[in-house]
Amino acid sequence: RSSAASDVYKRQIKPYVSSFTQQVMFAEKSWGSFRIMDVEKESLTIKVTLNPGHKMNYHSHEFRDEVWTVIYGEGRAVIDGEERRVKTGDVLRMPAGCRHMLLADTELQVIEVQLGKDISVQDKKKYPPLKPL
């Protein structure tokens, strides 16, 4: 981008873009991607794709339950310190307060349904990584 175009962007467009409050519906990350599929008053449905060898943080939520349905691939889930293998068709339920994570052995696609009265990205407590996985 030329410096003139960059200046126009900073002065004329950036203030508008910065003020958007619309929720991000798709994002690519180093570990894979996610796409928000449905938003309701007390639920949020997301398709999560983890790249082979990648994992999500070990974490919990205070105000929401989560249900994972594995729709493609194989990997491992850790739920409250217990590791188990997961594959296409498996369904896992994590109540609020439960520590959990996924690790992809192959590409792993999961439908994640978040259930609760106050679903928020701030409702996530991270824990140190588990060793070994």
Describe the residue ranges of each PLM region.
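Short acidic-glycine-tyrosine-enriched beta hairpin
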Residues: G81-R99
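Acidic/histidine-enriched, glycine/proline-rich intrinsically disordered or flexible terminal extensions
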Residues: S120-L133
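A short glycine-rich, His/Asp/Glu-containing loop-to-beta-strand
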Residues: Q22-D65
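Glycine- and acidic-residue-biased ligand/ion/polar-headgroup-sensing regions
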Residues: F63-R76, D80
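Single conserved hydrophobic/aromatic residue that forms the stacking wall/gate
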Residues: R1-Y9
